[in-house]
From Swiss-Prot:
Species assigned in the record: Salmonella typhimurium (strain LT2 / SGSC1412 / ATCC 700720)
PROSITE patterns documented for this protein: PROKAR_LIPOPROTEIN (PS51257), TRANSGLYCOSYLASE (PS00922)
Endpoints of the signal sequence: 1-15
TM spans (from-to): none
Keywords (A to Z) from UniProt: Cell outer membrane, Cell wall biogenesis/degradation, Lipoprotein, Lyase, Membrane, Palmitate, Signal
Lipidation (S-diacylglycerol cysteine): 16
Record GO terms (molecular function): lytic endotransglycosylase activity
Full protein name: Endo-type membrane-bound lytic murein transglycosylase A
Cellular component aspect of the GO annotation: cell outer membrane
Lipid anchor positions (N-palmitoyl cysteine): 16
Length: 203
C-alpha cells in the first residue's frame, strides 16, 4: 500500500513539475530594447497611423528580432516584428484592399515591416479581441494573440467569442496572466507576457 501511494505521489509531482517556468531561460531586455529603440521614430509614425502604442511596438521588436531588420526565423517569420507573409502579412494586405502577400524584401524593410506589424496589431484589437475593456489586459491579449493567434487564446475561455470576451472582462491583468499560465496550450504564451513586461520596464 505504501509503495502504491509513493508511486501515486511521484506521478502527481511529475505533473506539477511539467509546467514550464516562463522565466527560464533568463532573458535580459536591456540590449534588445536598446536596439529596438533606434526604430522608435518609425514606430511612433506607424503607431499614430494605426492607433497602436509605439512602446508596445518597440517591445515586440525587442522580443521578436532584438532590433535586427534582417532576422528570419525557422518558420520564415521575417524582419523587425517577425511577420509571416502567408498569415499576418496576408491579413494586412487584405485589410488594405490589396491582393497577395508581402515579399521578403518588403518585410525586411524597417518602415514597411513596422507599419504592417502595427496594422496587424490594430486588426487584432479591433477584430477578434474587440470588447476587452482593461487596457493592460488588452495589451497582454494582443501580444499573446500576436505570437500564437487570437483563436487559441479565446478558446481557453470559451468556444464562443462573445462569451470569451465577457469572461476576459471579469479578470484584471494579474488574473488574466495566471489564466494564460494555467490554460494556454503554448508554453511561450505566458513567457511572451513576461518578456513584454521586462521590455517595457527597460525603456
Amino acid at each position: 500500500m505504501k509503495l502504491r501511494w509513493f508511486a501515486f505521489l511521484v506521478v502527481i509531482l511529475a505533473g506539477c513539475s511539467s509546467k514550464q517556468d516562463y522565466r527560464n531561460p533568463p532573458w535580459n531586455a536591456e540590449v534588445p530594447v536598446k536596439r529596438a529603440m533606434q526604430w522608435m521614430p518609425i514606430s511612433e509614425k506607424a503607431g499614430a497611423a494605426w492607433g497602436v502604442d509605439p512602446h508596445l511596438i518597440t517591445a515586440i521588436i525587442a522580443i521578436e528580432s532584438g532590433g535586427n531588420p534582417n532576422a528570419v526565423s525557422k518558420s520564415n517569420a521575417i524582419g523587425l516584428m517577425q511577420l509571416k507573409a502567408s498569415t499576418s502579412g496576408r491579413d494586412v494586405y487584405r485589410r488594405m484592399g490589396w491582393r497577395g502577400e508581402p515579399t521578403t524584401s518588403e518585410l525586411k524593410n524597417p518602415e514597411r515591416n513596422i507599419s504592417m506589424g502595427a496594422a496587424y496589431l490594430s486588426i487584432l484589437e479591433n477584430g477578434p479581441l474587440a470588447g476587452i475593456k482593461d487596457p493592460q489586459v488588452m495589451q497582454y491579449a494582443l501580444v499573446v494573440s500576436y505570437a500564437n493567434g487570437a483563436g487559441a487564446l479565446l478558446r481557453t475561455f470559451s468556444s464562443d467569442r462573445k462569451k470569451a470576451i465577457e469572461k476576459i472582462n471579469d479578470l484584471d491583468a494579474d488574473e488574466f496572466f495566471e489564466h494564460v499560465v494555467d490554460n494556454h496550450p503554448a508554453p511561450q504564451a505566458p513567457r511572451y507576457i513576461w518578456k513584454l513586461q521586462q521590455a517595457l520596464d527597460a525603456m
